[in-house]
Amino acid sequence: LMKKRWAVLVASVIVNICIGTGFAWSVYQTGLFNEGAVIFGTEVQKSQLALAFTICSGVAPIPMIAGNGLQKKLKGPRNVVWLGGILFSAGLICTSFIHSLTMLYVTYGLLCGFGIAFAYGITIGNTVRFFPDKRGLIAGISTAAYGAGSIIFPPIMQSLIGSGGVMFTFRVLGILFGVMIIIAACFITEPPEGWLPTGWTPPAVKNSSGASAEGKNWKLMLADTRFYLMIIAFTIFATGGLMVVSQGSPMAQAIGGVDAAVAATAVSIIGLANTGGRVLWGWVSDKVGRYPALGIMAVIVAVSGFALSAFTESGSLALFLVFAMLIAMCYGGSMGVYPALTADAFGIKYNGVNYGIMFIGFALGGYIGP
């Protein structure tokens, strides 16, 4: 298992790169907006299109929580990841045939949203179970892969949109990602109950709240004041981060005065900061502690958010990128730290369900931010 866990991590990384393209929504949105009259039969507003991403993000806690129950019924994480991959792929392919905003909300918002969350929740929770000795770093790497999708694919997406249109792009990527996820999931297994890496002894757990030594289930977690402080902080990080990540393309065009191709590159640069932040802050949190790491990130987000709002009329793409990258880096950092933070605070045994509930904070950010 010591070697096998690395294969599981690599497979999970591939899955998360694929589903992470959902966060390059701003590239899709630009294509849909430009082709709106043909696709929808009328002009559409960017805010109407952005609602699809809001729904996609907002439904995430439901399948993340349900996925842990499905994992038992479907006999392992592999089948749940397959289910997520099929839903995500089907959502993209079905989006290529839509002719109304309502259908966009169903295909991209619900189908893709459920598919992404099923796969994401299982891959993150499962890899953290394989690496209790490196929770912060591994959670950071796993979630970084999710962010990497928004680095690798926007230029490819923009090229496909330029050559064949946005609907063609949905269709091609839907097929590609479906195949990649199904193959990668073949290598995903789960560790035995209570498994520990060879030679590693878990640190003593402070337990003064009446929870079992294995941790707190969701009911005990909801009775803990820390949960509410943690979820509020998660919402704040997600609000600022999703505002920049999901709307990077139109923001770059509006503030920097650049065309869609350059804006797609800006989205990739922001995605790089998002991805790098997940690994960086996951590693930092292992060294200095989860709460100090989050405190530093909070200060950076506050300063960068204020600066970004102050320079919106500057016309400088460089200034926009600097502050957008800082926000994205810390948003990504929170995504990398929170799976480990939740496991540290409430135990690893129930972390799948507990983190799914904690992810409601992210969903709220998805409603507020974009």
Segments (PLM) and residue ranges:
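C-terminal ends and interior cores of transmembrane alpha-helices
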Residues: 86-99, 300-313
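Extracytoplasmic gate region of multi-pass secondary transporters
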Residues: 25-32, 219-281, 369-370
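Cytoplasmic membrane-interface "Motif A"-like loop-to-helix N-cap segments
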Residues: 72-84, 287-298
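Helix-to-loop junctions at the C-terminal end of transmembrane segments
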Residues: 63-76, 278-289
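Helix-loop-helix hairpin linking two adjacent transmembrane segments in secondary transporters
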Residues: 145-193
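Extracellular/periplasmic helix-loop-helix junction of adjacent transmembrane segments
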Residues: 28-62, 261-266
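Intracellular juxtamembrane helix-capping segments at the cytosolic ends
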Residues: 32, 117-131, 138-139, 333-346
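Hydrophobic core of transmembrane alpha-helices in multi-pass small-molecule transporters
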Residues: 17, 91, 102-118, 235, ...
